[in-house]
Curated annotation (Swiss-Prot):
The lineage of its organism: Bacteria, Pseudomonadati, Pseudomonadota, Gammaproteobacteria, Vibrionales. Gene3D superfamilies: Fumarate reductase/succinate dehydrogenase, transmembrane subunit. InterPro entries: Fumarate_red_D (IPR003418), SQR/QFR_C/D (IPR034804). The chain crosses the membrane at residues 30-50, 60-80, 105-125. This is Fumarate reductase subunit D. CDD domains: QFR_TypeD_subunitD. GO terms for molecular function: succinate dehydrogenase activity.
Length: 125
């Protein structure tokens, strides 16, 4: 007996899992790491809770030029940008701005550009 449904033997693959993984990583980074960074750099150091010598120019440059520091700075800039541009892309669709592939390319190109600039600027240190 033949089944009453068709199975597509060559389904069209979606690129959405790639964008969703960057979206998820950016959202997680923005929710967990960014508030701590803002707390330390924007509140605790200016209030004197953390000694300002801990963030002297020489120490910050040595951190930024280390592999862990460089990856931290790149992730701090790039991952939230991928998250934001994914939200912009899907937000435009929700607001009935159907830009199609051009809108998708524009949104993800901006995120890619910011990511590339973060890497370039880190290597310029």
């Amino acid at each position: 007996m033949k089944p009453n449904y068709n199975v597509d033997r060559a389904p069209k693959r979606s690129d959405e899992p790639v964008w969703w993984s960057l979206f998820g990583a950016g959202g997680t980074w923005f929710a967990m790491i960014t508030p701590v960074t803002v707390l330390v750099l924007g509140i605790l150091v200016p209030m004197g809770v953390i000694n300002a010598e801990a963030l002297s120019y020489d120490r910050v440059v040595s951190f930024a030029t280390s592999i862990i520091g460089a990856l931290f700075i790149i992730a701090t800039l790039a991952l939230p940008m991928w998250h934001a541009m994914h939200r912009v892309h899907h937000g435009m669709h929700d607001l009935k701005f159907h830009t199609g592939v051009v809108g998708k390319i524009a949104c993800y190109a901006v995120a890619g550009l910011i990511s590339a600039l973060a890497v370039v600027f880190i290597f310029m240190l």
